[in-house]
Amino acid sequence: MCGIAGELAFGAAADVGAVQRMAETLGSRGPDGAGSWSHDAVALAHRRLKIIDLSCAGDQPMTDPELGLTIVFNGCIYNHRELRAELERAGARFFSTSDTEVILRAYDRWGRDCVTHFKGMFAFAVYEHESRRLLLARDRLGVKPLYLADVDGALRFASTLPALLAGGGVDTELDPGALHHYLSWHAVVPAPHTILRGVRKLAPATTLLITEHGERDERCYWEPDFGRQERYAGYTKQDWDDAVLEATRAAVKRRMVADVPVGVLLSGGLDSSLIVALLADSGQQRLATFSIGFDDVGELEGNEFRYSDVIAAEFDTDHHRIHIDTDRMLPALDGAIRAMSEPMVSHDVVAFYLLSQEVSKSLKVVQSGQGADEVFAGYSWYPPLRDAPGSGADAYRMEFFDRVGDEMAQTVADAHLARNDPSREFLERHFAKPGADGPVDRALRLDTEVMLVDDPVKRVDNMTMAWGLEARTPFLDHELVELAGACPPELKLASGGKGVLKDAARGVLPAAVIDRPKGYFPVPALEELEGATLDLIAATMSSDAARTRGLFRPQYVDMLMRAPNDHMTTLGSSKLYQLALLELWLQAHGI
């Protein structure tokens, strides 16, 4: 895992200084090394976190003069050894044992289609010296981020949005359509948009080829099928259980590929516990596991250690309980906001930030259970869609959207209000696409391709990489996602959600863990807006910067402030916190 940045200028020399400033902001993503390369119209920079091939042979930017290619890469190609062997049989010669060089050689052999050969998480840029073209690519599920900005006569890219801001020249006006998404989708802004008009993000499963003249060719190379498929027509329930278990086992095993130790973030829930169980079953001994807990606040419990302790004891892990005192929360909130590439409102952002800080003191790589709820239908909004009329888009909107009807106009000031309903339009377009059989399938596809990418996946990447920690997410293995997409929705909805995953796990996990009530990352100090947290919000919303910006109608903000814990979204999040978080993020990043 690393940080990348670069610029391709059109008809001029690249701004090397801007790229260097961008790279400097990526230091936490790559504390083990820094490198840069430039030639005429192109400049590339890299910050390295050493995970595979710890020698200087794996340093980046990596250039092969014989091939005429230079690459910067963030991520991990889990099948790099298999691909290396295949490429060697075809005559390729390697000077390192890095997965970076495998991408370079694969690109030489297969061109932009090389991405279809990769099993992993990645965002990379390859520059062709002779043609002066630049290829940008992002993995199938968008685990690794890649942000883009058009500046005067050039295209810039970076692993984070703040890195692009550091380069200068970026249009930082807010995008009204993106603001509408932010206030509808729990802060998610679907690709290619971001909250800022001048910054875009490359969509998952996408390659973008840019010529020296600025011409662009963008292609999507993968899209999972959420319909029933002929090859699974004869599957029994037991067949599905077995297939899901084996696909999960393969995904977990793949993510142990590293030249450094790999641990697990263990909440004690089904998903992270299954990762631990499968690793123990494969022979991993004294696996390092980590759980986090906070002070209780009133009746709100601050930890789930009793569940993680069961798994740690069952599989004899080297377990670490990490307790965070309440007085660390507010300073950590500031740090977490500064680490966000885009504003994110989930309270567990702070939990991941603090957990990553502690884990990074002893490890560079962990596996984490994000994604299983979206892939295997673990959330509360899926069951009501079973009998939804039509495409199911209206039912999904009523179950999921933070604001419906006239409330958006009551929230946002006229100058920043979208003149249509872009969030509803996006939802209806997505639900109308072929490749999903019913409303539940359509919702799972949307959540897998959009919500998952720009909420939990982005959250984990941003918070772990703030401390130079690489997080790997086996439930986002594309082969596992393809299998889950084909699985009948009734099997996923069973047993209160994730039914097929629960039944698949019964042979390897204690029933007490599988059948426990669904939990969430508990962060009690932020659940109730009071004390120092409420004071911070009040000061932020009444600040000169907020008043000058004028995003929200004052009477709406005043209403929320009078009863800060009474106004909640459909899924139970604070509407006031959502507004304040955006303003805090904008101020933290100098916007």
Residue positions per predicted region:
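Cysteine-centered catalytic environments shared across enzyme families
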Residues: M1-M340, F352, D503-G507, A512, ...
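Conserved S/T- and glycine-rich ATP-binding loop of Class I adenylate-forming
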Residues: L266, G369, L452
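Short low-complexity, flexible loop/linker segments enriched in glycine and/or proline
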Residues: D334-R338, Y382-P384, E528-E530
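Acceptor-substrate binding/catalytic loop of class I
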Residues: M344-S346
